[in-house]
A protein has these predicted regions:
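N-terminal core-binding DNA-recognition domain of tyrosine recombinases/integrases
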Residues: 6-101, 206
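Short pre-functional
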Residues: 72, 122-136, 152, 220-221, ...
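Basic, Lys/Arg- and aromatic-enriched nucleic-acid-binding interface segment
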Residues: 84, 96-99, 107-135, 139
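DNA breakage-rejoining catalytic core of tyrosine-based enzymes
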Residues: 84-86, 97-112, 160-170, 182-184
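Active-site-proximal segment of tyrosine recombinases
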Residues: 137-138, 209-210, 219, 227-238, ...
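Conserved tyrosine-mediated DNA breakage-rejoining catalytic core shared by Y-recombinases
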Residues: 140-176, 242
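Catalytic-site neighborhood detector that most strongly recognizes the C-terminal catalytic loop/helix
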Residues: 157-160, 236-261
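Active-site/catalytic core of tyrosine-dependent DNA strand-transfer enzymes
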Residues: 169-208, 218
Length: 266
């Protein structure tokens, strides 16, 4: 095989991974000095070289974890193809990440942000905060994806190129307004443009929140109302249940009931 990295990326593309995943994986694999010929020392030396950014600052644990995952997937594919006998990622140390809770937009701020927004921006904010869509999904969703008969919004080829449905709420429909044709946000945009537009609008209105924190608001409210992590993962397009628990924020009433129950004997 003349170029194993190109062959791997072609296989990943056939599996319908997102363009963002393909770009990130190609970038990481390009740093491997000898993709199929790295022994333990070479693998550890490569890993050491990834600990700092070009500017000399240390890489964040989340970034390192992603780099390790991309390399490990490549080597796992190489083993399936009979190109390697073992996965060099087994020599790499575990990346420890701090488990942080999601930060969400306060309800008062969300009300003000929606009230002041022009229709295209109001729809972007609503799709993130009231439907839990990612920036790429907001850019792609069209009026034809609103299925009023079944009460759902269809998200076509979300993360991992997977389709899913998001239940429609009266509040979301009110913020979206009268249906039209084409993209719900009013024009063709990509994920980066949506994220940047939301960020600029939020900062202009005195908020340092982001598109992701608008999405986090939806997931925390969904979990608080249902207590159903499986349903939350499905509606959010998460394949891993463990990633949804960071959005679980217990209310003070829930914690008080728990404390009262634990404080009783018998």
């Amino acid at each position: 095989m003349t170029d194993p990295i190109a062959a791997h990326l072609a296989a990943v593309r056939r599996d319908r991974y997102s363009d963002a995943t393909l770009t990130a994986r190609a970038r990481i694999l390009a740093t491997l000095p000898d993709p199929l010929g790295m022994d333990r020392l070479a693998t550890l030396a490569w890993w050491e070289s990834r600990q700092t950014r070009p500017d000399g600052e240390p890489r964040a644990a989340a970034s390192l974890s992603g780099e390790k995952a991309h390399a490990a997937e490549f080597w796992r594919w190489a083993m399936r193809e009979g190109l390697l006998d073992r996965n060099p990622a087994d020599w790499l140390p575990k990346v420890r990440q701090a488990k942080t809770m999601a930060v969400v937009v306060p309800e008062g701020d969300l009300y003000r942000i929606l009230r002041d927004a022009a229709p295209p921006m109001r729809r972007m904010v609503a799709l993130a905060a009231m439907a839990g869509l990612r920036s790429a999904e907001i850019a792609a969703v069209t009026w034809a994806d609103i299925d009023r008969d079944n009460g759902v919004l269809w998200v076509r080829e979300g993360k991992g190129r997977k389709d899913r449905s998001v239940p429609l709420s009266a509040g979301l429909l009110a913020e979206l307004g009268e249906p039209g044709a084409g993209p719900i946000v009013g024009k063709a945009m990509n994920a980066k443009a949506v994220s940047a537009a939301l960020g600029r609008y939020l900062r202009a209105h005195g908020s340092d929140f982001t598109a992701h924190k608008l999405r986090a608001r939806y997931l925390t409210r969904f979990l608080a109302a249902t207590g159903d992590a499986v349903a939350a993962a499905q509606v959010a397009g998460h394949s891993d249940l463990s990633s949804i628990t960071r959005y679980a924020v217990a209310s003070s009433d829930t914690m008080r009931r728990g404390a009262e129950a634990a404080g009783r004997i018998g």
